[in-house]
Regions:
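Bacterial N-terminal signal peptides that target proteins for export
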Residues: 1-8
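An exposed, glycine/acidic-rich loop-and-rim segment of catalytic or binding clefts
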Residues: 23-52, 58-279
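Bacterial N-terminal signal peptides
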Residues: 8-19
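Positively charged, low-complexity intrinsically disordered regions
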Residues: 3, 20-22
């Protein structure tokens, strides 16, 4: 029996409306870098008529760059990334990567499914983090350009065989990045498995709306439309509780600067920053 899962993430960034007509939607691809064995890592660049530009590479189905113009028309790269493959291969921060099979941490690298216990490799002290030491972020994905009437995009595909990193089932995963003229970058996931498995896909981009390298984000303001969050323990493992954000540093229901929340006195902040857990 095949099982299909289709989550999606939408990202909308407001930028200056430059005087360029709708025909400005375009895409191109080339070589980003090469592996030691000579395998090419491709890059796909998506552009719209507003001056926004997203670059995705096939290593880890990674969002490598996202140029967004400000109200004066000056474009800044608002996500953190590397200019060559070496940084992604040696790095441990998962910059911009597609995370799988299982995002976040599995305590002791263990889980049970349908009465059977599974052990996956540890890569975060006593935890398995973001799919293990060779998760989706370390794989070369196949890519193809996709276009429709209102957007331009790239679809990346990876097949994880049964038992890879200890996870059951052969899993075919597709990640599609698309950009439209409303300055919306959309990430859509589609996965099919041939037997029951666990799956928690996400994108691991780090944002600085002032532009990469332009200071910290403590004065930047965020809104998260969620009334509950998932507390974690000292090992950053979710406790299973769905706690109310009201009265905690995790409350971003109304616009608030990150710096204000980070400086609050709360037990959760002894373990991680306010947005380390889930909402």
């Amino acid at each position: 029996m095949r099982k299909t899962l289709i989550p999606a993430i939408g990202l909308s960034l407001m930028a200056a409306a430059l005087q360029v007509h709708a025909a400005g939607l375009s895409s191109e691809h080339g070589v980003f870098d090469k592996l030691a064995d000579g395998t090419a890592v491709e890059k796909y660049t998506l552009r719209n008529s507003q001056g926004m530009q997203a670059t995705v590479i096939t290593y880890g189905a990674t969002l490598q760059s996202l140029l967004v113009p400000d109200k004066h028309g000056k474009a800044e790269d608002v996500v953190l990334g590397f200019d060559d493959l070496d940084g992604y291969q040696k790095g441990t921060a998962f910059f911009g990567a597609t995370i799988g099979r299982f995002g976040n941490r599995l305590a002791d690298g263990k889980f049970s499914l349908d009465g059977k216990s599974y052990q996956v490799p540890l890569n975060d002290k006593t935890n398995a983090l973001h799919g293990g030491p060779k998760g989706f972020d370390k794989q070369i994905w196949k890519a193809e350009e996709v276009k429709d009437k209102g957007s331009v995009g790239v679809k990346l595909t990876y097949v994880s065989v049964d038992g890879e990193m200890g996870f059951p089932g052969t899993l075919k995963t597709e990640v599609t990045y698309s950009l439209n003229d409303k300055n919306e970058l959309r990430i859509q996931y589609h996965a099919t498995t041939d037997k029951p498995t666990v799956l928690n896909l996400t994108n691991h981009s780090y944002f600085n709306l002032a532009g990469a390298g332009n200071g910290d984000i403590l004065d930047q303001v965020a809104v998260v439309h969620a009334s509950r969050y998932t507390p974690v323990n000292e090992k950053l493992i979710p406790t299973g509780e769905l706690a109310a954000v009201a009265g905690t540093p995790m409350d971003f229901l109304k616009p608030v600067a990150f710096g204000k929340r980070i400086r609050e006195d709360n037990t959760q902040l002894k373990f991680a920053e306010p947005t380390q857990g889930g909402y």
